[in-house]
UniProtKB/Swiss-Prot annotation:
SUPFAM superfamilies: Concanavalin A-like lectins/glucanases. InterPro entries: ConA-like_dom_sf, Lectin_LegA_CS, Lectin_legB_Mn/Ca_BS, Legume_lectin_dom, Leguminous_Lectin. GO terms for molecular function: D-mannose binding; metal ion binding. Mn(2+) binds at residues 8, 10, 19, 24. This is Concanavalin-A. Homotetramer. Binds one manganese (or another transition metal) ion and one calcium ion. The metal ions are essential for the saccharide-binding and cell-agglutinating activities. The keyword Calcium applies. Keywords: Calcium, Lectin, Manganese, Mannose-binding, Metal-binding. Belongs to the leguminous lectin family. Ca(2+) binds at residues 10, 12, 14, 19, 208.
Amino acid sequence: ADTIVAVELDTYPNTDIGDPSYPHIGIDIKSVRSKKTAKWNMQNGKVGTAHIIYNSVGKRLSAVVSYPNGDSATVSYDVDLDNVLPEWVRVGLSASTGLYKETNTILSWSFTSKLKSNSTHETNALHFVFNQFSKDQKDLILQGDATTGTDGNLELTRVSSNGSPQGNSVGRALFYAPVHIWESSAVVASFDATFTFLIKSSDSHPADGIAFFISNIDSSIPSGSTGRLLGLFPDAN
């Protein structure tokens, strides 16, 4: 199975797999059962921003999800990613729908990682920014139902021609270049990621959510991972 670390923006409470009984953000380490969650007031049809940071000195992964009206949710979890992830990874965005559905639209995405090495005091950095997504976006690996180019956005899950979200859909987008996320000789490994998103649904219960994830470089969508598994995990263990 893939090795996955993720920050989930979970719109549907699957209490049977340990979700709290409300929409939440959570930090997932190798399992969809979040290590830590925080209540999130998801605003249907409004553009939100997610900001994720990690620093190997503090060994803390943190996320803030906010809306223009100032409403925000914060979650953090102490973890040493050296012990969890391989040295080289890919970073991506994932989303799913199930019986209930929503649009999982990404409007922009940026990422920066830095490795400050002991020996040379140099920093190896990888940085990318997408302020919009073109139809033929060469530097993204699209998996499942993910598509780019509609209105300059990235649609992670299936949307009909009139813009209605479709159920039982899963899609992911990964940056094409592998990221050197840690190195034994590095003094500091850090990264931050930001994406803006629009979740829209006419269902009484939008589902299922969007995640920023880090994985082994050959990661693919697990079979049967629509709905509550967010396109990340093969099962709910």
